[in-house]
């Protein structure tokens, strides 16, 4: 006889949008670490900005694996918008802060790649904000069929 056996603990629910967002945040954080080395040589203020941005992106990426929170999504969205705005200004009119205030910087390959990843991160975070799914390593929920079967059996 083929009987269903109740599962004591449900398998983790994998949320691909969380995995994508965590990946994009971590990748942009890594690119900001790479770019930050050159910017520290230009002026310590630029380097500190890149260091703070990369730390926030690494922490945000890690949190996205363990937590689903509207506040976390909003923080990521605001952070990505600020980074993209600063990048856009630095490539159009130039950043007029620091000892070597200069005109616009040229767009390089890593700049464009990082900007694209930031846009992808924004897209996924907005998607998560609109219809939140559990983070990959949050405590898994049992699916309704298993819960119904368990309640029928009196468990």
Predicted regions span which residues?
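Membrane-interface extramembranous regions
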Residues: 2-155
